[in-house]
């Protein structure tokens, strides 16, 4: 941790999970591994860091990091001997096996201060196959006094053997009114509701979007997608145009737009948030059964942006499915030939 990443207070939508884990800590019943799972933008990493800070704090009993003891000062400086974070190295999208082996070797050492040892892996779904297998050995034979916190927005990408050896702590987005009230205390403005629609009520992601002029972007992207589906835009030049923008922000919008389309198109999927403005005739042409696979493609593209990639090619991959034969949008699953199935 650094002063910029020192644990934030638990957010209102995290209170239940916080009190449960705090009770386990106070009662001496903490598990050796937890999987903190839920959509992005809910503050799971903040939660993990605060829990680690509470456990390592010298104050007893600690219900939060005091911020003033030796342990808290070292955590803020990133020098605590009993705390580690494991994440993809700069320019990579995966956590590699050598990183996990090094982490496991450190956790096997005696505690620097005679207490617990904490490690956070984030995002845990970035573990490649070899790294996950290496971590599994640590999970199967935990070193006494160690606690592993795995943070993931896509837990299904983790091997079942890893998931089964962790206690799972689920995080869900707050209701719209609660999220809107929280953002209103910090940013407010007319774009707050739009930002929440972008992100599926994920307050932290929405708060970040409120500062990025998303209203104008929303109007532009909505118009472009409408023109693409109507056959008035070619996907390749449009992909080139998208690649010159903040592509992470564009794909965040596309994920929200697709989720809104899914809610409108699939019976029982819930009420749309107003991002997708397609008329009923256009909606009827969408292959609804493949929308889930397409949404996965968008999220995978967002992950791919962490590494040096051909941005235009990524955008083309996501736009071409909407310009299928006869200009009828066909959302297809990865690996399937277009126009089949």
Regions found by a protein language model. Give the residues of each.
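Charged, glycine-rich active-site and insertion segments that engage polyanionic ligands
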Residues: 1-54, 62, 71-74, 144-147, ...
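Conserved alpha-helical scaffold flanking the Walker A/P-loop in AAA+ ATPase domains
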Residues: 19-25, 94-118, 126, 130-138
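ATP/adenylate-binding site constellation spanning eukaryotic-like Ser/Thr protein kinases
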Residues: 80, 100, 132, 163, ...
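Flexible beta-alpha connector loops of hexameric P-loop NTPases
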Residues: 89-97, 124, 168-169
